């Protein structure tokens, strides 16, 4: 069951309708034992998106207090924080659901679509459309590509690749995800470099593997369209160890 609070209280039906139909942005996190990974990065994301989308700052300490209030005694959960346009000042909705992990491995189908304002985490129906279309075709998710075939991200996660010496992130409009940011730091400390480069769908078969990463974790990618990818590699092993070493922060 999902627990929802808006500005610290259960919403009235009209408030809930306003929340799901209003202009805004959000962040998503997994909570374990009352902690989450990259809490400062989540607050920074919300602050930056709020200034760009809604024109005002956002008090990160208040957001954290609202998350703690919505969690109550719940220690493990999937949490989303939505900030949306409302009379006076932006409203903050926190949703609390059962904890979740990303299914692995993942099979992806390419879809020609580019999220508008891709650097902001916002809700669009188009992403869900392409994800459902891929699932109807026997895949787990869709990988978003521009008309020239340049890869950006999946509908729900960042995608990365291995080229034998480094982790390659797509050089394309995309969300700089929290898990991606955490991995970049951990990989650098472990001596595995990461870089941005243009990746086209036709190039994927020549790479040494691929993975998805989001708040729900990391998953190897075994298939993109008709192409099979290796899933046993030193890169994936290093990636898993790096992710496991990321500290959990008190909310």
Which sequence ranges carry the predicted segments?
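Short secondary-structure junctions
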Residues: 71-78, 137
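Phosphate/pyrophosphate-binding loop motifs in nucleotide- or prenyl diphosphate-using proteins
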Residues: 81
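Helix-start/capping segments and mature chain N-termini
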Residues: 1-69, 84-251
